[in-house]
Amino acid sequence: HAGGKFDGGGYKVSGGLHGVGASVVNALSTELEVFVHREGKIHYQKYERGIPVADLKVIGDTDQTGTITRFKPDPEIFQETTVYDFDTLATRMRELAFLNRNIKLTIEDKRERKQKKEFHYEGGIKSYVEHLNRSKQPIHEEPVYVEGSKDGIQVEVSLQYNEGYTNNIYSFTNNIHTYEGGTHEVGFKTALTRVINDYGRKNSILKDADSNLTGEDVREGLTAIVSIKHPNPQFEGQTKTKLGNSEARTITESVFSEAFEKFLLENPNVARKIVEKGTMAARARVAAKKARELTRRKSALEVSSLPGKLADCSSKDPAISEIYIVEGDSAGGSAKQGRDRHFQAILPLKGKIINVEKARLDKILSNDEVRTIITAIGTNIGGDFDIEKARYHKVIIMTDADVD
């Protein structure tokens, strides 16, 4: 291997699993050059398809330190493309700059388009949360920031609530985005739920008769970054998308809960807003459950429960059936006249129904037009969604291009 992660002194933490990254890049390149600026000298070596062209040699003096690597992907291996996408690389550079406070990263494209970007964030993951929430309405101005370390594991968490109804939690281990979460994310979520419930009880925001808020309740409108640095990460699988270290859960939970408890005590106005947002989410969850049960009872599989507005087709074969959703009864009338009754169904709806992107599930399901769509298509929603129950394999939405 070429990696420096195994000898104990090269890196404090590393994202590598096997220490073969440079070797793999070398093997997959038609040519690779390395310039190492070290101890006043520039050391150079060139490879072609993984084979050294010559021995390592000194080619000059330098007052800098660092490594320059140039490589050209092998088109015989990468047959689909060897062209790099600037925006994809820039997104990753920005992410790394957020995750490593005060580091400056530059990406420059010297091809025809000629573009260059620099990323440098003094706020680190706190700036990352602000970036993610830039188009939202935060309910507290400053993101919460927590950092601490234990047993060589460093934990950083930043979070901010907004007025939205979805949550965005991004977790990282040694700068690697753990898309599927893992023990560090579980530790954070557990601590968040417990601390908010404890604060709500102690300050009588949650009454004795109230049930505890669920994890789903306290995460509504939350944007959070959980980043840990671990000297020996154990990922589940080769893709590094989920962290498996059990101690990461305990340490993340401990570091975050202690600091977050202190934050809530020192910021009672913000704390109340957070708990009250959770209680509103809990009420909406209960209402949505009732609405879902109502929708479920009106099963789309029962012909008797199909919406009165629906002009159904005569075919019972979903594979050939299609439904046209049109605006208003007048459009519905025209569509009915022009359709083939055998396989084309028409569902006229009011023009402007509800913006489901900005509404809670209980509000969405209390809307007659939305319920009509759910019932007509037949797949149900959320955890009960079943594509096999679709009554039509083609859905055509016919609307004009105005605001509604």
Swiss-Prot record:
Coiled coil region boundaries = none
- Decide whether keyword Metal-binding is in the record: yes
One GO cellular-component annotation of the UniProt record comes to:
cytoplasm
Name what cofactor the protein needs. Answer: Mg(2+); Mn(2+); Ca(2+)
Q: Could you tell me the EC number(s) of this protein?
A: 5.6.2.2
Q: Which residues bear the site annotation Interaction with DNA? A: K352, N355
**Which keywords describe this protein according to UniProt?**
ATP-binding, Cytoplasm, DNA-binding, Isomerase, Magnesium, Metal-binding, Nucleotide-binding, Topoisomerase
Q: How is the cofactor bound?
A: Binds two Mg(2+) per subunit. The magnesium ions form salt bridges with both the protein and the DNA. Can also accept other divalent metal cations, such as Mn(2+) or Ca(2+).
Localized where? Cytoplasm
Primary location class: cytoplasm
Q: Which residue numbers delimit the Toprim domain?
A: 321-404
Domain of life of the organism encoding this protein: Bacteria
Gene Ontology BP term (one)? DNA topological change
**Reactions accelerated catalytically:** ATP-dependent breakage, passage and rejoining of double-stranded DNA
Molecular function via GO = ATP binding; DNA binding; DNA negative supercoiling activity; metal ion binding
Binding positions (Mg(2+) 2): D400, D402
Residues annotated to bind Mg(2+) 1 = E327, D400
What PROSITE patterns does this protein's entry cite? TOPOISOMERASE_II, TOPRIM
Q: How does it assemble?
A: Heterotetramer, composed of two GyrA and two GyrB chains. In the heterotetramer, GyrA contains the active site tyrosine that forms a transient covalent intermediate with DNA, while GyrB binds cofactors and catalyzes ATP hydrolysis.
The free-text function statement in the UniProt record for this protein reads:
A type II topoisomerase that negatively supercoils closed circular double-stranded (ds) DNA in an ATP-dependent manner to modulate DNA topology and maintain chromosomes in an underwound state. Negative supercoiling favors strand separation, and DNA replication, transcription, recombination and repair, all of which involve strand separation. Also able to catalyze the interconversion of other topological isomers of dsDNA rings, including catenanes and knotted rings. Type II topoisomerases break and join 2 DNA strands simultaneously in an ATP-dependent manner.
* Other notes: Few gyrases are as efficient as E.coli at forming negative supercoils. Not all organisms have 2 type II topoisomerases; in organisms with a single type II topoisomerase this enzyme also has to decatenate newly replicated chromosomes.
| Family label | Belongs to the type II topoisomerase GyrB family.
This chain's protein is named DNA gyrase subunit B
Organism, per UniProt? Bacillus cereus
What taxonomic lineage is listed for the species of origin?
Bacteria, Bacillati, Bacillota, Bacilli, Bacillales
- Gene name in the database record: gyrB
